[in-house]
Amino acid sequence: MSKNSGLPSFASTEADNSQGFVLSVSGPVVIANQLAGAAMYELVRVGHNQLVGEIIRLEEDTATIQVYEETSGLTVGDPVLRTHKPLTVELGPGIMNNIFDGIQRPLNAIAEITKGIYIPRGINTPSLNRTIKWPYQPDTKLKVGDNVSGGDIFGQVVENNLIIHKIMVPPKEMGTIVEIAPAGEYTLDHALLTIEFDGKRKQLTMVHNWPVRSARPVIEKLPCNYPLLTGQRVLDSLFPCVQGGTCAIPGAFGCGKTVISQSLSKFSNSDAIVYVGCGERGNEMAEVLMEFPELHTKVGDKEEPIMQRTCLVANTSNMPVAAREASIYTGITLAEYFRDMGLNVAMMADSTSRWAEALREISGRLAEMPADSGYPAYLGARLASFYERAGRVSCIGHPTRIGSVTIVGAVSPPGGDFADPVTAATLGIVQVFWGLDKKLAQRKHFPSINWLISFSKYMQALDTHYDQMDPEFVPLRTRAKEILQMEEDLSEIVQLVGQDSLGESEKITIEVARIIRDDFLQQNGFSPYDKCCPFFKTVWMLKNMMTFYNLAQKAVESSTADNKVTWNQIKNELKEIIHRITSMKFQDPTDGEQTLTAHFSTLNEDIITAFRNFSDLV
């Protein structure tokens, strides 16, 4: 009898006669025999503690199993129970505002059961709370005798003020409605809809299961055309992502990957967030758990905690290595489920490097042929199959709806080396690359995104959208990028011969580039006025900086040889204007769009007037 005998276990609920026996144990990899008829990726329970495992290789009646829990204490001859199903997640009300481990065990519920801070081995508790009664409202258009198929919405549950949970027919089910439950409060296991197909009746509840390694079906993938607004000026203006896009954030330790991931979770224009902490420090998840409940978003006149639209999957670095792979798949399956309701979901994976390291460790124990840096040869294929589950799609079922999953994957290359196999493979897959720079981070320039190596392939897809919002934005962005590139080209000359040897036009370029770097690209994520920058503020800041640059260049170019205008003259005469331009970031968005627009518009007019007066003086 195991020492956790008082806890719910698998054997007490789903034990099966099909059983094999452990042959060998090597860390998280267990080899068992007498498992003829088992399937690849079938879930098994290993040992007397019934540890969760997954079959990853089959040879005759011998199976190689990766175990998602600590394997110390397993011995040769221990039983291995088959479950006849793959690793699945439970999908239904109660996912949001919850924290799971890599195989969707609810950490809050386990803490209440065990009254401790550790997860006992082999514990088998339902992922979603079966005792809560949810207010269910059936779809009034459906009636007995109607035909339904996978993806059809037959009711809804108001999970909280941010998420209205649509209850759907599971993707592989279909039939004729025999019975419909009336509106009321029900638990997850209560039958809400009874359907009949081919003479067999099936009762549908609020919850259904889905295998994590299979993508949920869709009608078709659609082109992405709406930006994912992050609240970070450098990302929204220079390297935008779309809802349904794929992004990578590679960077060395201390560059701010986690802060960017967390600010995306806090301030992006997504309807739901799935945050997967995959192999990172436990303190980072603790930080999220402490900060998120205090953050609020406005819904109508009320403030609501953003934790209500967030689901956390925590698989920290001290948890079993094999479960890191499962946590990524668990996260993306949860995200696809909310996408099928017609929501725009953002999934943060922090970090995919730790997942790749788990693949490398298990691959090594399986004695597979190593490729670059010891990673398995199928690393690129695994990464691609994960990122390909992102996208904007037309969902199956009725009524027709469009949803999206955006994947933002943080990558931690050792020593910040972007030639690392994981970073190189990720770069070939993703459409947006936000490269973090150690030197910028050391200069305390945050977010430390290097504007010279980062890129976004969604620029053209979003140009139509930007033209509708503000026709001036695209030319402004192009001009700002040119100035930053020119500054980089001039920096070598400045280092060799000094800034005084440059022409006046180049001096203006260098100074305006410095203003863009320090007062536009740099952003204090911990200040109330700058933690989130709305898009209108970003555009106005860029507009005023470019207006100043264009007028300064014009003043220098139009001056005559005997009355040459210099940068020093402009700087001395327009000191107050330059100070106001550099102080634009201090305008607080909570004052409202009208107030800020009026302020920036006045500044724009003042810049034009100041240069007009300056040219009259000269």
Curated annotation (Swiss-Prot):
Binding site residues for ATP: 251-258
Catalytic reaction annotation: ATP + H2O + 4 H(+)(in) = ADP + phosphate + 5 H(+)(out)
PROSITE patterns named in the record: ATPASE_ALPHA_BETA
One term under GO cellular component: endocytic vesicle
GO biological process, one term: ATP metabolic process
Pfam families, per the entry: ATP-synt_ab, ATP-synt_ab_N, ATP-synt_ab_Xtn, ATP-synt_VA_C
Enzyme class label: translocase
This protein's UniProt keywords: ATP-binding, Hydrogen ion transport, Ion transport, Nucleotide-binding, Translocase, Transport
Keyword Transferase carried by entry: no
EC numbers for this chain: 7.1.2.2
Similarity annotation: Belongs to the ATPase alpha/beta chains family.
Biological function: Catalytic subunit of the peripheral V1 complex of vacuolar ATPase. V-ATPase vacuolar ATPase is responsible for acidifying a variety of intracellular compartments in eukaryotic cells.
Name assigned to this protein: V-type proton ATPase catalytic subunit A
Protein species of origin: Dictyostelium discoideum (Social amoeba)
